[in-house]
């Protein structure tokens, strides 16, 4: 082979200039579609000569420095391209001018406009509109800052990918090893890695020694995978001769050729995909947009109607414009933006106490709308620790205890065969407990060693006592470690029993172990391994394998003292001791068991109408076993394979629609069209996707979204980040999750437990219900705030309610009660109903507007006007004489206006009475809002069923009353807010109306419960 002068024909797999140029011309969409496809590599199929031909690399000397420099200049550095980021000021502006804020800004601008018109046309303009504009602007700015602060902690996806990129790499150039910056690594470089290194690029392994890599961040498989030059699988993600960029080498050494760098590596593709995906609008954002349309529609309709009416009534153009602006602004619920934000924040805090950390406030409600959950298996549905589940000895399967607190089944530990089996499992085992953990429960202890050996170690420690003492009594003499060729691990120990000097113990793949045995241990005695026993072994092996468990076989041999005296020189290179004709002792099988709370959580999801789909990189048999264990595939539901086995017919003769459950293999998924995938998602209620790749997880999420589902996705690996980002709500794991997955997600489960998602769904549904109640409560007071202005225009009476007083209601008395509804407990079991349909079940619908504006609001307005007319009548102005009095009433120079009894009133005296009316109207609204708050507690139940257990709400009732009294009676508020003290009797004017509201709504809900689905429900149930 020529020395490193790379062949001119060489075109790297995915980094050629052609690819670069064509990429520029393609649209972003095409690029993302390309990234969603499976990784296509053929380097794992090439032999060493073909690799040399393709990359022009001398397989011993590496590239020449000059050639490496050329390739670096052509392909660029080995780094991930950061995506275009949104500047912080734009994010801030989105919070400040997006969604509900735009309505308040419009109101503020209209207020300033109205004030400007008044300044230009009137000598002494009132400052009300100026105050209102300033207050509205302040509310939006404060709420915007609050929301920005809440979400500023989010979405730095690429930063966490950067942490995964190794800093240094050991390359061989011109036959010399040198450590260079990983960014300088080029395609065709010869790279060496050892245990503890991070892989600097995608490598095709050309030589290896006991090399194992941890691919969990990429594939989700927790077991270290061995790496060697052999081509072992068609799938490049599963073959043994490719090591992937940013995964870790955990033991051994390897040498490989760089086949892809930077963005073109498998990890780079995932990073680009995750950061490039467009994220849709959250359901609550869509609801708020819909709400704004409704409120704006109502405001503009009323404004324009009364603008035309005021022109007909003879007002000037400028007056009509002021009225138009006033009506539109009066329709804006100033306090609602703050209320919604605070309600979502309170729920987010409540969820954090239940181990759900919400990064994005809107995600709180999205989780409640979820109709499909695509859940990862390892660590989410399962405990993420391999545990011994079954043993087979004495021709019998024994069940081990897999519970987290060891409260499960026990088996006979006195058997001589168990004694022998446990001794082999303890001695033929390299796993050890890490130091200083004596006080930690055995199952929680950290172990140095792979997952299977850790499971065996913990099992034996629990059942038989100290493993280290057992090892001390039987010191290891020699060992043959496990390798992929012979598939067993063997060690020879000094024997503490008197029957022989040395004991040979072996474990490995069951069929390989059985082949090396001629006898079997039954009830402590060696018996010949006949066909009957082989069949019994085969049945046990198939049964345990069918449960999705990883099965290991164990055997031993007592080496006779005559042949193997003390000090015998055992040789593991050329074995000078028997490795056949051994005695088979038994099987032990391991599984990552389901978490205790998961089956119940899956059951809750099912009764809540939520479809739970398992998406895992694990083997289909294991995935199906866990799915059955946790109830994702419920008892009695069969897959096509189950039906075929039951009817004893080929699988292809079974109609897929007959099977409710379905296990889809990743390789089959690769060949499915969108339509076929949609069919699977539509016709099967219980689905498991096994052996899936990151791209496929994303395709599954998109498929569910095409069905109209609101999709939640759980994941912990880097491989999950595109799906987490694309889902309506991405849920990452707080303990086992990679930084990348946490950054891509909207919510983090602090305890990695699927059951916490169900708690989150419950909270999300509750906050949607409670937001409805909060909005209904807040909007109702809009009518008694708008109608005084309308009567002022139509009937030409003194203004019954001032702008400043409206602000005191919206941003004062109504705030705490509206927020208190966020603490209201659920009316019924909200986890027994179907997920809401975002198209039909809106946060604010016509029925809510009809109830708030057309019914309860009107009764409230009557209460306000009653107190207004009572005060004016007590001061001498009867209602009939008020019509048409406005112009004279507001004239500064009219100092002798006569009332109904002929008394004369100066301008200042009139205004004191008017402002007292404002205060009384304000107090009346507070009193009728008591009843409104109580009826908003429940949408269907009677208030007597629901009870008054919400302490915050009771505090809200007292708080709004105390605030109203404070504003009315505190000296100085007459000057600052134009609020005047009221006679005690005037407080009672609105009481009858408050009672009417309460009785009216109790009667409505009674009819609603008596006639479900009837006319009253169709017209009034919001």
From Swiss-Prot:
Subunit text: The sodium/potassium-transporting ATPase is composed of a catalytic alpha subunit, an auxiliary non-catalytic beta subunit and an additional regulatory subunit.
EC number: 7.2.2.13
Residues cleaved off as propeptide: 1-5
Region (Interaction with phosphoinositide-3 kinase): 82-84
Gene Ontology cellular-component terms listed: plasma membrane
Residues on Lumenal side: 109-131, 309-320, 792-801, 866-917, 970-984
Compartments in which it is found: Cell membrane
Ligand binding (Mg(2+)): 716, 720
PROSITE patterns, sorted: ATPASE_E1_E2
Family note: Belongs to the cation transport ATPase (P-type) (TC 3.A.3) family. Type IIC subfamily.
Transmembrane helix as UniProt keyword: yes
NCBIfam families the UniProt entry points to: ATPase-IIC_X-K, ATPase_P-type
Residue positions where Phosphoserine is found in the record: 16, 942
Alphabetic keyword roster: ATP-binding, Cell membrane, Ion transport, Magnesium, Membrane, Metal-binding, Nucleotide-binding, Phosphoprotein, Potassium, Potassium transport, Sodium, Sodium transport, Sodium/potassium transport, Translocase, Transmembrane, Transmembrane helix, Transport
BP GO terms, sorted: intracellular potassium ion homeostasis; intracellular sodium ion homeostasis; potassium ion import across plasma membrane; proton transmembrane transport; sodium ion export across plasma membrane
Protein name (database record): Sodium/potassium-transporting ATPase subunit alpha
Top-tier EC class: translocase
Reactions catalysed, as given in the entry: K(+)(out) + Na(+)(in) + ATP + H2O = K(+)(in) + Na(+)(out) + ADP + phosphate + H(+)
Cytoplasmic side: 6-87, 153-288, 339-771, 823-842, 938-950, 1006-1022
Membrane topology category: Multi-pass membrane protein
InterPro entries listed in its UniProt record: ATPase_P-typ_cation-transptr_C, ATPase_P-typ_cation-transptr_N, ATPase_P-typ_cyto_dom_N, ATPase_P-typ_P_site, ATPase_P-typ_TM_dom_sf, ATPase_P-typ_transduc_dom_A_sf, Cation_transp_ATPase_P-type, HAD-like_sf
Active site: 376
Role summary: This is the catalytic component of the active enzyme, which catalyzes the hydrolysis of ATP coupled with the exchange of sodium and potassium ions across the plasma membrane. This action creates the electrochemical gradient of sodium and potassium ions, providing the energy for active transport of various nutrients.
UniProt superkingdom: Eukaryota
